[in-house]
Amino acid sequence: MVDERLKQAFLVLLRQGLWGKKEVEQTDFPLTPDEWTQIYEMAVKQTVQGIIYDGISFLPKEQQPPRGLLIQWTVAIDQLERMNRRQNKLLGILPQIFGQEPAIPFQLLKGQGIAAFYPKPMHRLCGDIDLYFGNETQTEKANQRIESLGVRVERGQLGDSSYALNGIEIEHHKRLIDLYRPSVRKAVDCWEAEQFAKRTLVPSPIANHLLQSTHILKHLLLQGIGLRQFCDLAVTLKAQVAGIDRQELEEICRTWKIGKWQQVIYALIVQYLGFPEEELPMKTHENPAPLMEEVWQTGNFGHGDERFGNRPDGFWKGKAHTLRVMLNKWRLSFRYAPQEISWYLTDLARKRIKELFTHESN
């Protein structure tokens, strides 16, 4: 368990790296060598090691990490920069592939498009490349275009697909927004079609914002979330908030019933990441502490969550363990998006009952 003082020191470094400026108060420093090791481990867990590294540069030299750890960190950042350069190079090739006649329009989601908003874009940890093709038909055409190059494409159950190109994972998506309950999906589909028809290389500011916020909700529900996703949300919103129609955003949040979720993530980026409250697209009075505690516990994709131990062997034991983990996530998620969670649980129960009957028959 990380103590509160170390969390506050971590957040100071994170804010300094995120916004590229020194904080006035740095009362939690200096740190001991062991505490610096914990800071590094926390950064890896939250996948913000590049941002924390940048934040360290604003500390006096005598307060920076021990030389050995700093060298290790610098090597990791050098590798991160190399990864980003590889991705940027591949991004220059993709328009050539999909631009061949008949052209297949796409939008770049998240990733390198978001990195451009950071003070040091090359220090954002890059994942896979996400491409959005507007609908299922166009996504399948894109899949076939890639297969024509001799590349194997894996198709998922929800209509998404993935493959590796030049050693980099790429995903194709037929949808932009991660909301799935039938009562709003038709409205979301129509809105997505309107957005995609604008034929921009990246989503519009409001589409980008809603993509990120609903994607974070999905990760909270299914896996776990790290601070990197909130950093992405904060720097993107800071750069694009002037292009967001606040009345349109509020209407969408009412229709999709995600207003409370939007408000709690706004509260989180203000209280912990230093986003200027006066620049929020809507006011918030939500308490972000429970959500932030979940972020501390789970880390990126939930890989750092140690609360429930490893999944045990055996079909039923494994299912029971998964249920314990998911119930914890659902309780928290239900506070912020009850309609989405209720539908998800109903749909999941239907699928699991079918799965159990299949298991028993085998």
Language model segments and positions:
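Conserved NTP-donor binding/palm subdomain of two-metal-ion nucleotidyltransferases/polymerases, i.e.
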Residues: M1-G127, F133-N362
